[in-house]
């Protein structure tokens, strides 16, 4: 891996560009992301619970 001054400078310029473009989410966007994440976690949990119940019924009866 060859690290030189130009590659470090280029990386820092890219980081600066990303930080300039990015913004803090407003309350509405934050709540939407939180709701979608929560619903996704609940759905994955329900799928795991249903699979657990089905496997117990099929293999332990």
From Swiss-Prot:
InterPro entries: Prot_translocase_SecE_dom_sf (IPR023391), Translocase_Sec61-g (IPR008158), Translocase_SecE/Sec61-g (IPR001901). It holds the Pfam family SecE. It comes from the Archaea. It is found in: Cell membrane. One of its GO terms (biological process) is protein targeting. Essential subunit of the Sec protein translocation channel SecYEG. Clamps together the 2 halves of SecY. May contact the channel plug during translocation. Component of the Sec protein translocase complex. Heterotrimer consisting of SecY (alpha), SecG (beta) and SecE (gamma) subunits. The heterotrimers can form oligomers, although 1 heterotrimer is thought to be able to translocate proteins. Interacts with the ribosome. May interact with SecDF, and other proteins may be involved. Belongs to the SecE/SEC61-gamma family. This is Protein translocase subunit SecE. It comes from Methanosphaera stadtmanae (strain ATCC 43021 / DSM 3091 / JCM 11832 / MCB-3).
